[in-house]
A protein has these predicted regions:
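Active-site segment of metal-dependent pyrophosphate-handling enzymes
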Residues: 94-141
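Conserved Nudix-box catalytic region and its N-terminal flanking loop in Nudix hydrolases
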Residues: 49-98
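Short connector loops at helix/strand junctions that flank enzyme active sites
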Residues: 33-37, 49, 65, 70, ...
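A structural signal for short, well-ordered beta-strand segments
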Residues: 40, 85, 134-136
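Nudix hydrolase/Nudix homology domain
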Residues: 63-68, 127, 131-187
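Residue-level signal for short segments within beta-strands and strand-turn junctions
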Residues: 42-44, 58, 138
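A structural signal for the main folded, soluble domain(s) of proteins
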Residues: 41, 51, 90, 115-116
Length: 187
């Protein structure tokens, strides 16, 4: 990879319009600016639209520990928020999850992750990131893919407990609590 101007990397020559960054490019960008992410709290709802179950993923983190987390991922250059949200829901939950994206995708919260603990409730050791967080009803069947090991369904009361929040990485317990409050089911 060569650089242009003041150390700005050129896009890979084999894919000049690629929206993906290789590991070197991603590390370079992460060290210089916040990245935009979407996060989703998958939920099941009853006939009146009341949340009856909350889905959380089980994953192995970079240290090899098994932790709970939410659907999450970067927004690619040129990608709409709606498309990024759908892509990450399908990537993590499988193609038959059938997420019900809202007509107007407005996040319940904007979360700002910092690599330094204490600057906000949200921590990501790799980077400074801004995440748009959504509650998304899903109606299909689930086959966790990529690095997700399992999707666990819990009641809103279970998802509201401090012990459950402690199992979520990077402050996502706080984000889950805000999600539950946004749909009126904080236990």
């Amino acid at each position: 990879m060569s650089t242009v101007g003041a150390g700005i990397p050129e896009p890979p020559r084999d894919e000049p319009n690629s929206a993906w960054l290789n590991d070197t490019e991603l590390e370079w960008v992460r060290g210089r600016m916040p990245l935009l992410y979407v996060e989703a709290v998958p939920v099941r709802v009853d006939g009146l639209g009341v949340v009856t179950q909350v889905g959380v993923l089980l994953r192995a983190n970079a240290q090899g520990e098994i932790t709970r987390t939410l659907v999450s991922g970067r927004v690619m250059y040129g990608e709409t928020i709606r498309d990024a949200l759908f892509r990450h829901l399908e990537k993590d939950l499988g193609p038959m999850a059938f997420p019900q994206l809202p007509a107007s995708p407005v996040p319940f919260q904007v979360a700002e992750y910092f690599p330094i603990p204490g600057l906000s409730a949200y921590v990501d050791e790799r980077q400074h990131a801004v995440s748009l967080a959504f509650v998304v009803p899903v109606t299909g069947t689930f086959e966790p893919r990529q690095d997700a090991l399992e999707l666990t369904w819990v009641t809103p009361a279970e998802a509201s407990s401090p012990a459950f929040h402690a199992e979520l990485e990077g402050g996502r317990g706080t984000l889950l609590r805000a999600a539950l409050a946004s749909v009126g089911v904080l236990g």
